[in-house]
Each structure stands twice: as structure tokens, then as C-alpha cells.
Amino acid sequence: MRHLRALCAIADTGSVRRAARELGVSQPALTTQLRRIEQSLGAELFHRGRDGCRPTLLGRTVLSRARTVVDSMAVLVEEARAEAAALGRPGPRLRVGSTASRIVGDWLRRLRGRMPETDITLQVDVSATVLLRCCAPAALDLAFVHEVEGSPLRVPDGLVQHTLLEREPQFISLAPDHPAAARPVVDLADLAQDRWMVDPSVDGEWDGVRRVLAAAGIDPPVLHGDYLTTASLVALGEAVAPCQPTSGPRDDMVIRPLRDDPLAVRLLLVTPPRCPAAGPAYEELTAAYAAAALRAGPYREWLEGAPERPGALLGG
């Protein structure tokens, strides 16, 4: 972890000197550490110059994975501390798990308002499989997960599935100056020459994207990276990426639906049997999702565009 944090700090600050100051170590010590890392890998991770350090191609690949590991470790430490603190507090507890979603924050806020006497903790993981395994031995009380269409999750025996949405379309994120960004709906063929960015650590995402691209008869280059790397590359026009339709607006990125909605996921709340919080959790999850759908302009328009779409989310 120390090596990964050092690499991330150098990339974030743009120089070994500033990274050393941020990490609280001497510049020579950090320089030596970087050299040892590069020697162990057999290649340089950064270009050094008068203007600072820039990641090499290999460096960008390593950093895309390193950030995920560092962020996951930070979440793990925070959750472990919260768990340790909670063990010393009496009263009801609710251990919530979730894959990455724009609605999790609002969902937790609503849950805490609904159950003010309950100590609610959150575990976030990119892998739905990990969360489902935590539910099976009752390490989690419930988990909100998504299942990529065509890549069914292996739900452990005994768990109860509550479907929030049978088919949520996945939209595409583009740079504002991308030619397809001017259209209300984007065809896959319009993205055949773009680099596609996917997160291989998300269960089923790469397989789902690969199937859809193959069915469309296109074979664009594919990059693997985490959310932060994806967002920066999309904003710079270096890639396009599938995204949740509830994604909020950004000045440096536009969100558009794909024609005929070829990419989709199923949204599930999974609980052990006889979970007393299942009903309230599902109701507040539905409310949080509907609120997010209303805030996301392209998704709201998509929901209003055809009668067979889940208009109940909009109160219809």
C-alpha cells in the first residue's frame, strides 16, 4: 500500500518533491522508492522533466489499478473503525452494502430519517459478487447491486431478491465537443472509431460491452480503468464510456442514451430471509431512485419518451 500511495501522490502532484511533502517523507527517500518500484517492474512509470513527472503508458495502466486499491483500502479502514465503534454502542444496527451508484447517498439519508434509532453502516464495493457473499453469512443485512444483462449474478442460496428495476438502460458519456454529443440519441456506429473505457473490476461489465459491440459489428479499441481515470479521459475526448442514466450534468461531459438501449442492467435489493428492514429499505431506495431520475435530464426525457418505459418512477 505504501508503494501504491506513493505512485498516486506523484501522479496527483506532478512532481516527486511535492509528493514527498504531501506524504511527509524526504525527496531523496521518495526518489529511491520510485526507482525500486520501477526496477521491480522493469520499466519507467513516469517521464521526468523540468516541468515535473508525467505517467508513462505503463504508468497510466498501473495508476488506474492503484487508485482503486488505495481507495478501497481507505474505505475498508473507515468501515472497520465504524464497525469497531458500533460494537460498543447498544441499539439496533443495519449493515448496508452497495455497488457504486449515484443514489446511495440519498438512500442512506432517507433510511436514517426513517430509522433514526438505528445505527446504519455502509460498505461499498465495485463487485456485486463480493456483496452477495457478505449477505450470505449475514455479514451484511442487505445489499443494493446491479446485474449486467447477459451476465447473471450467482446469488447464494437462501437470499431474497427484490427487483427495483428490471431493465435500466446504460447511457454513454462523451466529451462536449464529440460529434455525437449534439444528437439527443447516439448510435453505436457513431462510436465505432472511439476508444471505449470499461472497468474490468465491475462484475460482467466488460463481457456485456463486448457482446453489444460484437452484435453491432464494430470492434473499437477498449481501455480498462477505474471511475476517476474514465471521467478524466472522457472529458478530454480521449474515450467514451457507458454510464448510469442517473449521472448528473457536468460542464466537461455530456450524457446521452444509446439507440435501442443495447446496454442494460437489472437493479436488485438483496436480503437474507426474514429481514425486517427489507420493506423500509426498498421503499426508500425506490424514492431515492425516482428523485435521481427526475434530476437527470436525459434520463427523465428517456422515461417520458415511451409508454412501456417505467414511468412510475416519475410519479406517473
Swiss-Prot record:
Keyword annotations of the record: Activator, DNA-binding, Transcription, Transcription regulation
GO molecular function, one term: DNA-binding transcription factor activity
Domain HTH lysR-type: 1-56
InterPro entries the record matches: LysR_subst-bd, Tscrpt_reg_HTH_LysR, WH-like_DNA-bd_sf, WH_DNA-bd_sf
Gene Ontology CC: one annotated term: protein-DNA complex
Residues making up the signal peptide according to the UniProt record: none
Domain of life: Bacteria
DNA-binding region ranges: 16-35
Annotated SUPFAM superfamilies: Periplasmic binding protein-like II, Winged helix' DNA-binding domain
Function: Transcriptional trans-activator of the gene (mprA) for the small neutral protease.
Protein family membership: Belongs to the LysR transcriptional regulatory family.
Name of this chain's protein: Small neutral protease regulatory protein
